[in-house]
Regions:
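A glycine-rich helix N-cap at a beta->alpha junction
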Residues: 73-81, 93, 164-188
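Short alpha-helical scaffolding segments that buttress acidic/His motifs in well-ordered protein cores
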Residues: 12, 35-39, 175
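C-terminal helix-cap and adjacent tail motif
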Residues: 2-4, 11, 18, 90, ...
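Glycine/small-residue-rich phosphate/adenosyl-binding loop
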Residues: 49-130
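Small-aliphatic-rich amphipathic alpha-helix that forms the alpha element of a beta-alpha
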Residues: 35, 39, 103, 112-162
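Short acidic N-proximal helix/loop "leader" segments that mark the beginning
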Residues: 1-34
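Short secondary-structure boundary segments
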Residues: 107, 153, 179
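Glycine-rich phosphate/pyrophosphate-binding beta-alpha loops
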Residues: 43-46
Length: 212
């Protein structure tokens, strides 16, 4: 393997969903642009590039979204049984304000017109394309020693209104992006006992899906 190949694998292994590790500084514009450039180079069905990136840095917007996320997190917590709630409570949904930068990735289902090459029978390939851009962004951020935290505790209609996103464009991810003090060795959900990762062999099938 070349050094570059090893670096790719190292980035994948060290990728973490960052919450409490942001150092309070803001990622500089040049670095952010390199990271977004990597995201924009992701593969996409029919070369439609159905994503857009909304960079959010205004403190009032960050604060408003953080408050909304806290409410959504509480709603989820209230649905848990006592034992599961005890495991969940230490898991914080932080980083919206301390990262100083939110990158909202959107998906435009109309990008590319009515007939998109490769999307005719599997419509979700458009959405999958936008998610590939997120993965590119995340790995590029790791290479820059920049953390990313994917926030999914939000109401889509609220975020659409907050950022004045036109229909039918959808916000599919709010990513907290910023320099970090360090990356955790063990993913948070494993550290706090919420869920452990599956071994590759459990996910690997040959020729047909193996029923357990």
């Amino acid at each position: 393997m070349t050094e570059a190949t090893l670096s790719v694998y190292a980035a994948i292994r060290s990728r973490r969903d960052v919450r409490a590790e942001f150092d309070g500084t803001v990622v500089d514009d040049d670095t952010l642009r390199r990271i977004l450039g990597a995201a924009h180079q992701a593969p996409s069905v029919g070369n439609t590039q159905p994503w857009d990136f909304v960079v959010v840095r205004k403190p009032d917007t960050l604060s408003a979204f953080a408050a909304h996320v806290a409410d959504c997190r509480q709603d989820f917590a209230d649905k848990l049984d006592p034992e599961r709630r005890q495991t969940f409570d230490p898991i914080r949904i932080e980083g919206i304000e301390t990262s100083g930068t939110g990158v909202v990735v959107t998906y435009d289902p109309n990008r590319g017109g009515l007939h998109v090459l490769g999307r005719d029978t599997v419509d979700d390939t458009g959405l999958f394309s936008a998610v590939l851009a997120i993965e590119n962004l995340w790995l590029a951020a790791i290479a820059e020693n920049v953390g990313v935290g994917w926030v999914s505790f939000y109401d889509e209609a609220y975020l659409t209104e907050l950022l004045d996103i036109p229909a039918p464009v959808r916000p599919i991810a709010w990513l907290c992006v910023g320099p970090v003090e360090s990356f955790q060795e063990v993913p948070d959900l494993e550290r706090f006992g919420w869920r452990t990762g599956r071994p590759l062999d459990d996910a690997l099938h040959f020729e047909q899906y193996r029923r357990s």
